[in-house]
Swiss-Prot record:
Belongs to the aspartate/ornithine carbamoyltransferase superfamily. ATCase family. The lineage of its organism: Bacteria, Pseudomonadati, Pseudomonadota, Gammaproteobacteria, Enterobacterales. It is an enzyme of class 2 (transferase). It comes from the Bacteria. Catalyzes the condensation of carbamoyl phosphate and aspartate to form carbamoyl aspartate and inorganic phosphate, the committed step in the de novo pyrimidine nucleotide biosynthesis pathway. It catalyses: carbamoyl phosphate + L-aspartate = N-carbamoyl-L-aspartate + phosphate + H(+). This is Aspartate carbamoyltransferase catalytic subunit. GO terms for cellular component: cytosol.
Length: 311
């Protein structure tokens, strides 16, 4: 059966329908159960990271290797023609697209991946994060993890805690879960880092329930998923960072009264917003969540590069 993601750019989670999201998740589950080490044999994929990354870059490159493809690229754009000689992003993508079958790209500028897609021809761009905007593959692994731990993506009570203003992961995840039914969002953040108005407006237009809170304690007993985020020092001025960095810290004692099925997730890296004593609780699932990135990203790459995919 021809798959709808073949040669499709993956720029925003909003570019994917519920059916397409479920296709990626089914493919990820199949690849987790049964590895396919030659599925992308002879394919070449560019890994173009214009912004620092550890987990996302290594996860993508591991995914590429485990599917049998080759990877080329860079993790320091200062040593590229774009960084040293002033080449435009459009020209850079126009050239790289002649070398490879797909391009995985992270960039600090919002909208950079969508711009790149205008110049990559038939070569799909996979957005690995563009500024504070979108991080669709993190969302796919988040969805995969929620489904794996809860057995569903409908009727989920999820709290998002911390930096909801600049945290692209929570923007994308909220938009994705809004495609499913009966979910309730609890947004817990200081005013300076509140969820953007456009996200709240989207939920209101879809008549999806959400509530705003200043305390984690009052909502823990209601939750299926507790999604923690770090305060992003690199996106704040020093005075703002100092004011909010320690406002929301999760300790094991905060999980008293939690549901048995509760899982604590975090896109990582964590700084001090989850204390290490939480790691030892049955609720901690953030390291397994990171590991699921391999399967979600394998699934996405397999789908954008295969006209037909039957696993």
């Amino acid at each position: 059966m021809t798959n709808p993601l073949y040669h499709k750019h993956i720029i925003s989670i909003n570019d994917l329908s519920r059916d397409e999201l479920e296709l990626v998740l089914r493919t990820a589950a199949s690849l987790k159960k049964t590895p396919q080490p030659e599925l992308l044999k002879h394919k070449v994929i560019a890994s173009c990271f214009f912004e620092a990354s550890t987990r996302t870059r290594l996860s993508f490159e591991t995914s590429i290797h485990r599917l049998g493809a080759s990877v080329v690229g860079f993790s320091d754009s200062s040593n590229t023609s774009l960084g040293k000689k002033g080449e435009t992003l459009a020209d850079t993508m126009s050239v790289i697209s002649t070398y490879v079958d797909a391009i995985v790209m992270r960039h600090p500028q919002e909208g950079a991946s969508r711009l790149a897609a205008q110049f990559s021809g038939n070569v799909p761009i996979v957005n690995a994060g563009d500024g504070a905007n979108q991080h669709p593959t993190q969302t796919l692994l988040d969805l995969f993890t929620i489904q794996e731990t809860q057995g569903r993506l409908d009727n989920i009570n999820i709290a998002m805690v911390g930096d909801l203003k600049y945290g692209r992961t929570v923007h994308s995840l909220t938009q994705a879960l809004a495609k499913f039914n009966g979910n309730h969002f609890f947004f817990i953040a200081p005013d300076a880092l509140a969820m953007p108005a456009y996200i709240l407006q989207m939920l209101e237009e879809k008549e999806i329930e959400y509530s705003l809170h200043e305390s984690l304690e009052e909502v823990v007993p209601e939750l299926d998923i507790l999604y923690m985020t770090r305060v992003q020092k690199e996106r704040l001025d020093p005075s703002e960072y100092a004011n909010v960095k320690a406002q929301f810290i999760l300790r094991s004692s905060d999980l008293t009264g939690a549901r048995d099925n509760l899982k604590v997730l975090h896109p990582l890296p964590r700084i001090d917003e989850i204390t290490t004593d939480v790691d030892k609780t049955p609720y901690a699932y953030y390291f397994q969540q990171a590991g699921n990135g391999i399967f979600a990203r394998q699934a996405l790459l397999a789908l954008v590069l295969n006209a037909e995919l039957a696993l």
